Design a protein with these regions (language model features):
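Long, compositionally biased stretches
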Residues: 271-296, 316-337
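Short beta-strand-centered segments at strand-helix junctions
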Residues: 299-313
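Hydrophobic residues within alpha-helical transmembrane segments
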Residues: 139, 168-172, 205, 209
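C-terminal membrane module of polytopic membrane proteins
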Residues: 208-281
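Membrane-helix interface linkers and caps
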Residues: 1-5, 41-86, 106, 254-269
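Alpha-helical transmembrane segments in multi-pass membrane proteins
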Residues: 12-63
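Juxtamembrane helix-loop-helix connectors linking adjacent transmembrane helices
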Residues: 32-38, 67-140, 158, 268-271
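Membrane-interface helix/loop boundary segments of multi-pass membrane proteins
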Residues: 143-168, 192-199
Length: 337
């Protein structure tokens, strides 16, 4: 848990995203640009540039090096990346089949309307086709992983603890996608993967590979289709295929989540670097951090600066040892007590 994120608030993010939406769409609506150009500019600005620029400004203001989100502490675990992608997609496809079956037999008219208005990749324009691939397989994975796993997870871990942070950030991630259940599970796996590897590039690789497969599948079914009838829709739905695929996906997802969940509090969120740490080479009166002494009826306490708390990765109810060495106080985190 990093106390720098105590001052970077979620409501600020959502508020500025709404402002960014208006700042982008109003000028575009008043201009004479084509529909495809408007789509490209709006998607890049609203869903990539604005969120990352906001986070860049906020992290720099709060002494966090923005580039530390992209630190690569080790080699990418390609075996885990491929396995997580495949099993996650199997689960998502299975859940989608189950939802499709339920809607086809309970709300068929709603499903027909949803499919007819659904997003199908337009292959008639080569430039839009290329942009769709870049947006889905490059821009979206980078933005979503940095925002949801890099920022949301850090902020929520500070506010509610790491386990609640995994759940709540994944719920928000799921609500932003059509397949809410599949996206929620994907979000949980991505959070645990980030905590385990401490490498956002692992998440970006899984996300990019997942989107590449999903986008390619859209291309396969991207041709214009005739009107969909309700009887035909109900015949196409297959509950047992959905159940089978979901079970296959869960055979890997449940053990993985269970194993990582049991150690998530001890491992905690990945560390970030601080601007002052990079600029300061040696201690001097100009860069000393002053801490306040607090006296109560029972004890005297010294407030630790954010840099010390983050360096030791301290959380509520953790224990530390305090030792006096010459004229210095040495504080160490106790891992086993």
């Amino acid at each position: 848990m990093h106390y720098a994120f105590s001052r970077i608030r979620l409501r600020s993010f959502f508020g500025w995203m709404i402002i960014g939406l208006f700042l982008t769409m109003i000028p575009l609506g008043l201009s004479n640009v084509s529909e495809s150009t408007m789509e490209v500019i709006s998607q890049i600005t609203i869903f990539f540039v604005f969120p990352l620029f906001w986070l860049y400004v906020k992290t720099n203001k709060n002494n966090v090096v923005f580039n530390s989100f992209f630190d690569k502490p080790g080699r990418l675990p390609w075996g885990l990346i491929v396995l997580a992608t495949i099993m996650g997609m199997i689960f998502s496809v299975g859940i989608s089949h189950i939802q499709f079956y339920i809607l086809a037999h309970t709300l068929p008219n709603f499903l027909v309307t949803m499919l007819e208005d659904g997003t199908v990749i337009n292959t008639s324009n080569i430039y839009m086709t290329i942009f769709t691939f870049i947006s889905a397989c490059v821009l979206a994975p980078i933005m979503e992983e940095v925002i949801f796993r890099g920022f949301f997870l850090q902020r929520m871990a500070y506010k509610w603890g790491i386990k609640k942070a995994v759940i709540i950030s994944s719920i928000i991630f799921g609500l932003g996608h059509f397949d809410v259940i599949g996206a929620f599970m994907f979000g949980v796996v991505m959070c645990l993967l980030y905590i385990k590897t401490k490498n956002i590039w692992t998440n970006i690789a899984v996300h990019a590979l997942n989107n590449l497969i999903a986008t390619s599948m859209q291309f396969v079914g991207g041709e214009e289709s005739s009107a969909i009838s309700i009887p035909e829709l109900q015949l196409q739905s297959n509950l047992w295929i959905g159940i089978g695929l979901t079970v296959v996906g869960l055979l890997w997802l449940i053990p993985y989540v269970w194993k990582q969940w049991s150690t998530v509090k001890e491992v905690s969120v990945p560390p970030v670097r601080f601007i002052n740490e990079e600029k300061v080479v040696s201690a001097s009166p100009e860069n000393e951090v002053y801490s306040q002494v607090i006296v109560t009826d029972r004890l005297m306490a010294v407030e630790l600066p954010d840099e010390a708390v983050n360096k030791l990765r301290l959380e509520e109810n953790d224990y530390v040892t305090v030792a006096v060495e010459d004229d210095k106080i040495v504080i160490k985190k106790v891992h086993d007590r």
